[in-house]
Amino acid sequence: MAQKKEEAAATPAAPTAARLQTLYHEKVVSALTERFKYDNVMNVPKLKKISINIGVGEAASEPKLLETALQELSQITGQKPQIRKSKKAISNFKLREGQAIGCRVTLRRKAMYEFFDRFVSIAVPRIRDFRGLPDTSFDGRGNYTVGVREQIIFPEIDIDKVPRIQGMDISFVTSATTDEEAFVLLTELGMPFKKKNN
């Protein structure tokens, strides 16, 4: 009997799906299929990745700002950020080619759904004077980007330890071919867009 308990404890538990991932498979797929009349389930749009980018233009004169941005982005996403470097020199901005100007994290699979859930459930409601996210930031190919002005909306960031308020861009990349499909997909997943006045 004790041996069976040890064997059961030794086998790792099956990974659990994120809440929104389960919601997508159980409800969103059928809602999108009904709305857009897809012939095949594989044609139903899905969230492919989320990219979070923080630009730190002053990193050349103040390298500590880039270190802070890296640390905060790591706390928010749970992944190590990549340092973004300038592709060309721009003398007006005192920018040299290859100079660090920001950082980025790309989330996929379970981490992506967990971040999306935290973003719409916890972070977005903490935005000051929030009345909904704009629905005008689609790129024409089914991807949506939103700018966040303050990193302190994320609960992982301690407001007392923040040296300065820093914004970021969050891009939601979908497999949708049109903005309408992407809008419905993100709405079904819980994205709080502005209500349209009739």
UniProtKB/Swiss-Prot annotation:
GO cellular component: ribonucleoprotein complex; ribosome
A Pfam family hit: Ribosomal_L5
SUPFAM superfamilies from the UniProt entry: RL5-like (SSF55282)
GO molecular function, one term: rRNA binding
Coiled-coil ranges per UniProt: none
GO biological process, one term: translation
Source superkingdom: Bacteria
Record keywords, A-Z: Ribonucleoprotein, Ribosomal protein, RNA-binding, rRNA-binding, tRNA-binding
Record function comment: This is one of the proteins that bind and probably mediate the attachment of the 5S RNA into the large ribosomal subunit, where it forms part of the central protuberance. In the 70S ribosome it contacts protein S13 of the 30S subunit (bridge B1b), connecting the 2 subunits; this bridge is implicated in subunit movement. Contacts the P site tRNA; the 5S rRNA and some of its associated proteins might help stabilize positioning of ribosome-bound tRNAs.
The protein's assembly and partners: Part of the 50S ribosomal subunit; part of the 5S rRNA/L5/L18/L25 subcomplex. Contacts the 5S rRNA and the P site tRNA. Forms a bridge to the 30S subunit in the 70S ribosome.
Assigned protein family: Belongs to the universal ribosomal protein uL5 family.
Stated name of the protein: Large ribosomal subunit protein uL5
